[in-house]
Structures are given as C-alpha cells and as structure tokens.
Amino acid sequence: MKKVILFFLFLFCSLSFGQVESFESDYIQMLKEDIQGVSRQIVAENLSLTEDQANKFWPIYDEYDAAYDKLVDERVKVIEEYIMNYYGIDDEVGKDLISKSFDLKYRAIDIQKEYIDKMLEVLPISVVGKFFQIDNRIAAIIDISRMASLPLLREEE
C-alpha cells in the first residue's frame, strides 16, 4: 500500500503549481489512465472473487469507472480554474469554485451509491462492502495527493 501512496503522490505532485497553467490534455489523459490502471490493480489484488463473482463484478466496475471518469474531467477543469485565478480570486469566483467542488462531491457520492446498489443486486454484501472500503481508501489517497499539490488560497494582503 505504501507503493500505491507514493505512486499517487508522484502523479499529483507532478501537476505542481507552475505546471498547471499549461495543462496538456494528453498528459492529463495519461495520468488518468495510470490512476485507473493502478486502482483496478488494487481492487483486483484485494478483492477475492470467485469466477462467477468476477464475471458479475468487473462489468459493473467498468461502468462505475467510466461514470466516475466524467467527474474527474470536471474536477480537472475546476482545478484549472482555481490555478488560473489564483492571484485574483474575488468573492464571485471563490463562491463559484466552492459550489462546483460541493457539486462534484455530491455527484461522486450519487455515482458510488448507484453502482454499489447495482453490485448488491448480484453480489454478496461481504464482496460489495469490501469493495466499498477499498474504493474509499483509493479515493482518500487520491484526494490527499491532489490537495498536497495545490497551494492554499491566498489571503488578502
């Protein structure tokens, strides 16, 4: 797990403050694919599935990952907006960024609930519950990595 944490820290720290102004869509796509690949690997290594369970789980997981991926794209746009306005965030922009951040969090929870419910229809709670725990840990690592790479909002001088 330490290797995973270091991997995510490396990925997000590479999006340092100075580099964010020139976001490259290919670079962002590469980071997303790396994160998705590592996330899938972590889930596979930590979730003991029978063949029947795997045949039911992975298609739902892939749908979940695709739905969540759309939120990642929106989160990148919010981060870009934050960085581009970093030296001049007024009340309107600040409130808008906070509103967008809350919206993304609520939508992420809605997506997670939707796919957890789909999994519960075909898999035992022990499998779904463990996946839920793994998924939340991965999300926490990603969030910490992302937050560590962004500067805090400047205070008025």
Regions found by a protein language model. Give the residues of each.
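Positively charged n-region of N-terminal signal peptides that target proteins for export
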Residues: 1-4, 19
